[in-house]
Amino acid sequence: MKYNLNQLFKNYKINGLSTNSQTVKENEVFFALKGQNVDGNDFINDALNNGAVLVITENKKNTVIDKVIYVEDVYEALYEAIEIFYPKKPKNLISVTGTNGKSSVVSYIAQTYFLLRKKAAFIGTIGLEIFGCNNIINDVPSLTTLDYLNFRKIAHNLAEDSIEYLAFEASSHGLEQGRLGKTKVNIVSFTSFSQDHLDYHHTKENYLLAKLKLFTDHLLPSGIAILNSDIEEIEFVKDYLRNNNVKFITVGKKGDVQITKITCSLTGQNIDFIFNNIIYNLHTLIIGSFQASNLLIAALTLYYTGFKFDEIIEALSKVKPVKGRMERIDGTNIFVDYSHTPDALEKALIELQNIKPHGGKLSVIFGCGGDRDKTKRGLMGKIAAKFADNVIITDDNPRFEDPKLIRTEIIRGIGTATYTEIESREEAIKYGINNLKQDDILLIAGKGHENYQIVGDKKLPFDDSEVVRKYLFSMSCTRNQQKHLVSSRTVV
């Protein structure tokens, strides 16, 4: 029997939709989706016990249960229901993909819109952030790319609060798994491409093709793609987009928007570039020459949504660094960065080597995540040994792997170079700080914005930036106490 969902839903008191039997709320409709690892049909009774008013499934065996409705395609039914319950979305949708740089770009985009007096928001690895609205949206899942239902719930709520611009990250996993559903966006961009997630995609070609689904499956015909011209595979990407009739523009040293000079320091950078035959200069507090293309991708995004370029550049110069992205801790020479891929780690280390004071040394603290791409561990060890003066290997998010074995795989890549191995990440950070001398720089890499450490199935509170701040504060207190003791002893 074919159901008219709109008519069917009128017969029930329905408060919302859910695809999770554990979090489904009373009077919500539960859609029993069959995923790669979990089948929602196995949890229909759980959903009903938790208060689901209806269950939609494409498994006929389950329809003997009261309140269970059979449909031929449960995903199509979900999409139809989403249009009924969460039809609204911000007028301008912008999506960003790439191995590294996604979080930075979506943040820069939303910040710049707000600086130009527009309400904007971004969704991604860091979470949801809203500019120009006091409403707080709770229960945002911690995924780079949300599933389609949660994305549309949030987009609907943002539109209800008059948010006009929404920028969001699109991961290769999310694209491959169809989490964007039928989402169509105005602008897409490609920040970078290098090895990552081979545990999932198996080959770099599969990984690249997964990312390109954003451009072929989710960009409106009237939309435009913005590409980093410095991507090694850029010619393949451009040919692929041409063959799929996707309009694009490139940014970079050889881009349509050409970066001609970057001058970096510990306090920011100046970027000279040419756009439409006009020479521009952008001064920013954002550290890292690799951020130049990210900033200009953000600039072009606003340009193609109708803003004047001069106004964009003026506003863009005021954007703030993103937490855990080359984050300089309280004016010290200690940096926290999310660089968890070989390419990102190499770029971060090269950048800091180039801007460190004369005579200073560069130390790096990092580990690798468990149950993730194992092939990058030795590569990252090799990169650290090549570009850092001191290497400290510690734990990242070991998950269900033996952390000692993860560290051993990293150390194999280091070869004959010297290193220090410290299991506890907190102790490794303290060790790195204790061994800093004047003009030295310390990079704490891999976790960035994360405020947890995953050990087994537990998320333990842990924040690199806060560990640094607390330890620096304790050192300051100790020094003050020592000064007080010395001064009190000299009083006659």
From Swiss-Prot:
Keyword Cell division: yes
Cofactor needs: Mg(2+)
Chemical reaction(s) catalysed: UDP-N-acetyl-alpha-D-muramoyl-L-alanyl-D-glutamate + meso-2,6-diaminopimelate + ATP = UDP-N-acetyl-alpha-D-muramoyl-L-alanyl-gamma-D-glutamyl-meso-2,6-diaminopimelate + ADP + phosphate + H(+)
Pathway membership: Cell wall biogenesis; peptidoglycan biosynthesis
GO molecular function, one term: ATP binding
Keyword Amino-acid biosynthesis attributed: no
Alphabetical GO biological process terms: cell division; cell wall organization; peptidoglycan biosynthetic process; regulation of cell shape
Binding residue positions for meso-2,6-diaminopimelate: 372, 396-399, 446, 450
Principal location class: cytoplasm
Ligand binding (ATP): 98-104
The protein's role, per its UniProt record: Catalyzes the addition of meso-diaminopimelic acid to the nucleotide precursor UDP-N-acetylmuramoyl-L-alanyl-D-glutamate (UMAG) in the biosynthesis of bacterial cell-wall peptidoglycan.
Name of the protein in its database record: UDP-N-acetylmuramoyl-L-alanyl-D-glutamate--2,6-diaminopimelate ligase
